[in-house]
């Protein structure tokens, strides 16, 4: 399977698979990195999709940069990746985990499909539980 390292507006990313009309944006969770998409890409690419995976702020190749993982930093990056994907694919789906799923729901209006693994659906509730 083809895997190409790309930079999207300074955001480190990997594009998996051959050229296709459909794609998935893959977003990792807390402490994750873009390379986690490889196993998913091995299943999705033979079915006619490409998979684009980015490093969220402070993760993967972005560790050591003075970036925080917060909605005001992650959501604009996800929208930048979506803009990039919209220029290449007719249909964009989402595969996201945990906090990546939460940020995706803030950034992504109408994915063709959404595959969410352990999504954070109630951020306020999560924070209150962690603080008690």
Regions found by a protein language model. Name each.
Residues 1-18:
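N-terminal cap/lid segment of alpha/beta-hydrolase-fold proteins
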Residues 21-29:
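Short beta-strand element of the alpha/beta-hydrolase
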Residues 36, 68-87:
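Alpha/beta-hydrolase active-site loop
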Residues 109-132:
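Hydrolase active-site cap/lid region
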Residues 95-104:
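Gly/Ala-rich beta-loop-alpha elbow adjacent to hydrolase catalytic centers
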Residues 41-63:
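Conserved alpha/beta-hydrolase
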Residues 30-42:
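The serine-hydrolase catalytic nucleophile loop
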């Amino acid at each position: 399977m083809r895997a190409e390292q790309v930079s999207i507006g300074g955001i480190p990313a990997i594009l998996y698979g051959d050229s296709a009309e459909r794609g998935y944006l893959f977003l990792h969770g807390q402490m994750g990195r873009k390379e986690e998409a490889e196993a998913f890409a091995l299943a999705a690419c033979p079915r006619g999709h490409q998979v684009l995976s980015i490093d969220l702020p402070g993760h993967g190749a972005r560790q050591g940069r003075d970036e925080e993982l917060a909605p005001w930093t992650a959501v604009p990056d996800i929208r930048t990746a979506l803009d990039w994907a919209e220029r290449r694919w007719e249909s964009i789906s989402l595969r996201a985990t945990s906090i990546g799923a939460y940020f995706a729901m803030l950034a992504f209006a109408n994915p063709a499909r959404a595959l969410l693994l352990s999504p954070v659906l109630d951020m306020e509730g999560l924070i209150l539980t962690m603080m008690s």
